[in-house]
Amino acid sequence: MWSSSQASTRGVIEVGRVEAGPSHFPKRPAPRNSSRVNLSRTYAIKSCSVSSRTGLCLGQCYHKKSSACKCKLGWSSQPLSSLRHHLRVHSSASEAVLTSQSDFTKLLVGNEKIGVLLLNLGGPETLDDVQPFLFNLFADPDIIRLPRLFRFLQKPLAQFISVVRAPKSKEGYASIGGGSPLRQITDAQAEALRKALCDKDIPAKVYVGMRYWHPFTEEAIEQIKRDGITKLVVLPLYPQFSISTSGSSLRLLEGIFREDEYLVNMQHTVIPSWYQREGYIKAMATLIEKELRTFSEPQKVMIFFSAHGVPLAYVEEAGDPYKAEMEECVDLIMEELEKRGITNSCTLAYQSRVGPVEWLRPYTDETIIELGQKGVKSLLAVPISFVSEHIETLEEIDVEYKELALESGIKHWGRVPALGCEPTFITDLADAVIESLPYVGAMAVSNLEARQPLVPLGSVEELLAAYDSKRDELPPPVTVWEWGWTKSAETWNGRAAMLAVLALLVLEVTTGEGFLHQWGILPLFH
């Protein structure tokens, strides 16, 4: 699925029809004269419009060689917020022109019951929740991608990894109070969003669906059905799209929607990413500006954006737009800071990698050490991919990376808080929901050259079909082993280690004996 964030209020959008055509790459806006410090290789990022067999035009491609389609569009010269002055209500007796915000919102709502589903990762609320939470995480095929032949081992492998990793993870959660605050913060965001929508005359109900812990997405969907929601806006709380975050949650939703008659008939739309929205960018810039003032010499502070990493294969092989969206997001935030007279240097790195496979570089820990060696004395960490505080901000950044920075010679450390319920941010989410309502159950396209992507993005099924079809078109790896493994797959899985683990598991299952049975792991699956 290609991600496209919705247009901001200055966006240029119009319902359109997408037709396949010759390869065409719209010109990407010239990059700003950035002072970002690049500690790794330079990247060539291309934007293209991608057409799928569903007819839905979706956002940015990030790979070296790709074919694209050409969208025949009729562009509107007006932002969505001004459309209310031109919408008309037709009746048998008269035709009335909408001239007020109240009229516009009444048209949007009508007799519909509107719901907003916020999607997030979830987190263990107690130490006893840690191991089952990790099991749910690693049992997700979008997190650990096994070769098709061995996918039946997904859950046994997830059980093994979760048991092995649980003790260390419990130590981390114990250090931040015994559990993740993610649910509490997300519930607060949902309530704040509900109030913001109400203030804008949109009486919507807001639901929270977590991917790996309570309240699970399935629980939220059941409540949506009980409440009789007729129009649903699906809003992942991840600013940038990735296969492993928004993609995983949307794939789960696809299965739920496909199997439920009520949901099949319920109109819905999805906002897969929203990192370009003006309100979000301004909220991030405001938090950074505020934290810079806490330093004795703000102008000498390096702004250090730390994003959650993903395996490199997701970007290079599966076409994940996460890296391209993250880099553009950093540019947009720095552009906003420059408008405020803040011209500090910045850099971007990726944290939270696990396992022996290659992840997106540069790595946060290695970058901190390198910055210390280069003489950086003041560092302000910005958790750019997180909108809520949780273990990766409270423990990994605040404790581990802070200690590493001080040991590396960086004397002054600061950290920008996650957005949480920051008013500008919440208001912007409310605007995003309102802007998507006219397109629930429809398709729309946007001007990629103006960096104003799609506002409603279509149904879950359409989005995933579009992503999957594009992924199938990616060029195959250069080298394929004679037994069907690519070199990248060998790197990804660690062929020798993988085969050894599989052999042990097969022996355990067939003989009923071994260390996994002694530890009480495999009997859980009998």
From Swiss-Prot:
Xref: PANTHER family: FERROCHELATASE, FERROCHELATASE-2, CHLOROPLASTIC
GO molecular function: ferrochelatase activity
Protein name: Ferrochelatase-2, chloroplastic
Gene name of the record: HEMH
Reaction equation(s) it catalyzes: heme b + 2 H(+) = protoporphyrin IX + Fe(2+)
EC number from the UniProt entry: 4.98.1.1
Entry superkingdom: Eukaryota
Location, primary (coarse class): plastid
Gene Ontology biological process terms from the UniProt entry: heme biosynthetic process
Keyword Chloroplast: yes
UniProt keyword annotation of Lyase present: yes
Metabolic or biological pathway, per its Swiss-Prot or TrEMBL entry: Porphyrin-containing compound metabolism; protoheme biosynthesis; protoheme from protoporphyrin-IX: step 1/1
UniProt keyword terms in alphabetical order: Chloroplast, Heme biosynthesis, Iron, Lyase, Plastid, Porphyrin biosynthesis, Transit peptide
Function per UniProt: Catalyzes the ferrous insertion into protoporphyrin IX.
Organism: Oryza sativa subsp. indica
InterPro entries xref list: Ferrochelatase, Ferrochelatase_AS, Ferrochelatase_C, Ferrochelatase_N
Subcellular location: Plastid, Chloroplast
Sequence similarity: Belongs to the ferrochelatase family.
A Gene Ontology term for the protein's cellular component: mitochondrion
Enzyme class: lyase
